[in-house]
A protein has these predicted regions:
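Reductase modules of NAD(P)H-dependent flavoproteins
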Residues: 1, 137-243
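A short, basic/flexible loop-to-alpha-helix module at the beginning of a structural domain
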Residues: 94-107
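Conserved beta-strand elements of the Class I
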Residues: 110-113, 206
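Ligand-binding loop in jelly-roll beta-barrel domains
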Residues: 58-64, 104-108, 134
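Ferredoxin-reductase
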Residues: 1-88, 144-146, 172-175
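Short, conserved phosphate/pyrophosphate- and ester-handling motifs at nucleotide-, phospho-/glycolipid
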Residues: 33, 118, 210
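Histidine-anchored nucleotide/phosphate-binding helix
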Residues: 119-131
Length: 243
């Protein structure tokens, strides 16, 4: 079913990513980790549809937050990140998805691993945990190119500072802050072993990002002893489409 959302607020996350909040009057509610299809239609009738993860907590009362990273060759993301304005209307379909989700009744340790914009659905999980008052312990391993590429920086910092049940580890692949304890580079088996929950605690692991990132991270998790049936993945293709 297609819904119409009105843009309520906009903010830049990075130089190439923007978050927008939509007011959707007939929104049925969603679960953290789900996504929506967004449809843009040109005056000549041509339409383009892209899928984007929902960033807002499950208890969002008719407001849906989406964060989009601009792709230079994209059809939809340049408009959403550069031209969309408060008061504009967007068509969206959803919520979609039932596997890559976190539900508030889950009490086991949760391991989140994000690559770049793959943080978006994981942020919905973190926010849903907070809004529900859940005591489930969360760990987030967030891989980004450089500090300037971090989404939700201030909110993540505040959450990890004020909630002992949420911990955050950054992995910078190109440029790290001065005196950072780890050289820039991709995540590897050692980092996964050090940052993730021990397998004997039975964590559920959620991994989201580009296809190659997700495949590597999932392989490292399995090699470290994590149960394959406790690893849930969401992949983005070369164009940013979900798989």
């Amino acid at each position: 079913m297609w819904h119409v959302g009105k843009v309520f607020a906009l903010r830049d996350e990075t130089a190439t990513a923007r978050t927008f909040t939509l007011e959707v009057g007939d929104w049925p509610g969603h679960v953290a980790g789900q996504h929506v299809d967004v449809r843009l239609t040109a005056p000549d009738g041509y339409s383009a549809v892209r899928s984007y993860s929902i960033a807002s907590a499950a208890r969002s009362e008719g407001r849906v937050e989406i964060t989009v990273e601009r792709l230079p060759s994209g059809e939809v993301s340049p408009y959403l990140t550069q031209e969309l304005a408060v008061g504009d209307r967007l068509e969206l379909r959803g919520p979609i998805g039932g596997w890559f989700v976190w539900r508030t009744h889950q009490t086991e340790p949760i391991q989140l691993i994000a690559g770049g914009s793959g943080i978006v659905p994981l942020m919905a999980m973190i926010r849903s945990r907070a809004s529900a008052g859940s005591a489930a312990p969360f760990r987030l391993l967030y891989s980004v190119r450089e500090p300037a590429a971090v989404f939700y920086r201030d909110e993540l910092q505040a959450l990890t500072n004020n909630d002992e049940g949420v911990s955050l580890t950054y992995a910078y692949t190109r440029v790290a802050p001065k005196d950072w304890p780890r050289r820039p580079g991709r995540i590897d088996a050692a980092l996964i072993t050090n940052a993730a929950w021990p397998s004997n605690l039975g964590p559920t692991c959620y991994v989201c990002g580009p296809t190659s990132f997700v495949e590597s991270a999932a392989a490292f998790l399995i090699a470290s002893g994590q149960s394959p049936d406790k690893i849930r993945t969401e992949r983005f293709g070369p164009t940013g489409d979900r798989k």
